[in-house]
């Protein structure tokens, strides 16, 4: 719908421009005003898009395109967020001065947003500590606990498109450096809106913030290198590494070296931070084509593995040689890597247990991730926790020794980092690969061994993209009011509706459909895109590994077809 020119709109734009310290976004908005007042409908619609609503602060903080206006990421919005979060910390810290550590990645304006946050926090009376340079998100998450501060802020948009940026918030103390969960997000959001009633130009600033010592990164490197525990020669596995134009390499290189791994073959065009992300359309290892350059480098070098971090290095992608793929390599799914690392964690916990007693600890994954991890937990007599989507939930599982999400997120060292960490996960994966190499085996062989011991677990994800968000509400309502008795030829045995909570799970707009062959379908709206997502899982433990693979894969394909038909129209 086309917007209408109103005095109110232009007054709101003028008020925003008046408080904006960034000449780039000021000029951008002033140009749009001139064009809109001259009759440009496109400029007017753009202004309405920027000013009719604002970026919502939620449990994932803020994330959006860099541009002027309250519905974009910019210095005004970040100032409001920083001041609002400062008020929250001051309100919730008794008897001492609250403290916050602030980190930033290599995206456009990340350093500016971080310094603004440090100055505004210090001006508000919060002890602010700024990391000394751009660093991976896991280092910031580590620093919250290592420095013993009240909170953390990470300026990053992770693997979003190049023009995006974001603002992630962590809490220390009893939260152990995890990301925030409800209702904390709503409390912070309310204080941000209070700040937004005035001008950020009037907020007190101070340059009395501290710069964190270099030892913070070095302590992270030492703790992460210690994730490698095999006694086998650790330089036996060759691998290529890409930072996807992000900030992972400087830190990861030191971790790999300290752990004793072979020097990786780097994907040179992607190794240094570059906010333009020139070689990828989307800097997300899951996106088609994102790892093409990595595969080319790996083929030329003939390496055993490909290791990829996303731009802020909180995610890990792994690829193994595969002659049946045109690229020569196959990227493992997040569920495959999660299963292998979960099995590794269970083995380590079992080795630590004395006299055959049950090992201590819990394995955890989000409800949309593969049931394979539960099979591992059951086999090793470990606790298992399924959580809502997001590491803010996975990281809080009691007794956690390993957690993962299917979207390439893994938590392998909960004693130091309570968030997904692509560098420590890479260390654990390389540690596993080197121990396998000492036995003459590969990561691909270990996947077959997993299928032989626990069954073959197949997964797929399908999405329905809509132009009208009400379509998603309609589909979810229809599934609730008229639940299917069968999907294809497979009977439905149970449907769990998580909207009011289920078991230990908090309320969430998720449906879990269980079938009589043990398969499962999870249905939920996307939290970031106009999509309905369906996660399909099936397994088989009958026959050879090849037969198990064929059976489970066929079940997933049949369920995917049935769900597409059920939700069509």
Which role fits each region the language model picked out?
Residues 51-71, 157-160, 243-251, 255, ...:
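Conserved phosphate/anionic-ligand binding catalytic regions in large, soluble enzymes, centered on
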Residues 113-121, 163-172, 252, 314-337, ...:
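Short Gly/Thr/Asp-enriched flexible loops that form oxyanion-binding sites at enzyme active sites
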Residues 299, 303-305, 309, 326-328, ...:
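Phosphate-binding and adjacent anionic-ligand microenvironments
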């Amino acid at each position: 719908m086309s917007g209408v020119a109103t005095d109110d709109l232009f007054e709101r734009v003028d008020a925003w421009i008046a408080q904006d310290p960034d000449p780039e976004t000021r000029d951008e908005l002033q140009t749009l005003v001139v064009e809109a007042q001259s009759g440009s409908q496109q400029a007017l619609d753009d202004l309405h898009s920027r000013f009719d609503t604002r970026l919502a602060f939620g449990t994932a903080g803020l994330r959006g395109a860099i541009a002027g206006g309250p519905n974009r990421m910019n210095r005004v919005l970040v100032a409001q967020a920083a001041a609002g979060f400062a008020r929250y910390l001051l309100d919730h810290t008794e008897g001492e001065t609250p403290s916050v550590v602030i980190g930033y990645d290599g995206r456009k304006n990340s350093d500016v947003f971080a310094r603004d946050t440090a100055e505004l926090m210090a001006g508000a009376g919060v002890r602010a500590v700024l990391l000394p340079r751009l660093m991976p998100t896991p280092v910031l998450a580590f620093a919250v606990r290592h420095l013993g501060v009240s909170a953390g802020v990470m300026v990053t948009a992770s693997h979003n498109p190049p023009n995006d940026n974001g603002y992630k918030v962590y809490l220390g103390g009893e939260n152990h450096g995890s990301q925030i969960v409800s209702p904390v997000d709503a409390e912070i959001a309310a204080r941000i809106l209070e700040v937004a009633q005035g001008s950020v130009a009037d907020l007190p600033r101070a340059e009395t913030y501290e710069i964190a010592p270099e030892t913070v990164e070095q302590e992270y490197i030492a703790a992460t290198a210690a994730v490698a525990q095999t006694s086998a020669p650790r330089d036996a596995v060759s691998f290529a590494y890409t930072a996807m134009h992000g900030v992972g390499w400087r830190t990861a290189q030191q971790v790999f070296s300290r752990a004793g791994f072979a020097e990786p073959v780097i994907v040179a065009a992607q190794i240094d931070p570059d906010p333009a992300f020139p070689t990828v359309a989307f800097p997300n290892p899951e996106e088609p084509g994102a790892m093409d350059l990595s595969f080319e480098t790996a083929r030329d070098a003939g390496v055993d593995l490909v290791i990829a971090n996303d731009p802020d290095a909180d995610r890990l992608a792994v690829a193994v040689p595969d002659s049946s793929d045109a690229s020569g390599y196959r990227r493992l799914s997040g569920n495959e890597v999660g299963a292998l690392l979960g099995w590794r964690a269970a083995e380590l916990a079992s080795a630590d247990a004395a006299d055959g007693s049950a090992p201590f600890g819990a394995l955890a994954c989000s409800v949309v991730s593969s049931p394979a991890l539960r099979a591992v937990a059951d086999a090793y007599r470990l606790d298992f926790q399924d959580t809502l989507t997001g590491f803010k939930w996975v990281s809080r599982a009691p007794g956690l020794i390993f957690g993962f999400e299917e979207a390439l997120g893994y938590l392998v060292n909960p004693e130091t980092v309570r968030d997904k960490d692509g560098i420590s996960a890479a260390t654990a994966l390389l540690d596993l690969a080197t121990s396998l190499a000492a036995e003459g085996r590969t990561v691909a062989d270990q996947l077959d061994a997993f299928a032989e011991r626990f069954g073959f677990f197949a997964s797929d994800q399908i999405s329905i993209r809509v132009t009208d968000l009400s379509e998603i509400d309609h589909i979810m309502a229809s599934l609730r009011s008229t639940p299917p008795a069968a999907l294809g030829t497979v009977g439905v045995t149970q449907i769990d509706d998580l909207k009011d909570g289920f078991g230990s799970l908090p309320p969430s707009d998720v449906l879990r459909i269980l079938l009589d062959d043990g398969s499962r379908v999870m249905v939920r709206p996307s939290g970031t895109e106009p999509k309905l997502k369906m996660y399909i899982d099936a397994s088989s433990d009958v026959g050879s590994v090849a037969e198990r693979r064929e059976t489970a894969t066929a079940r997933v394909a049949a369920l995917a077809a049935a769900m597409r038909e059920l939700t069509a129209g």
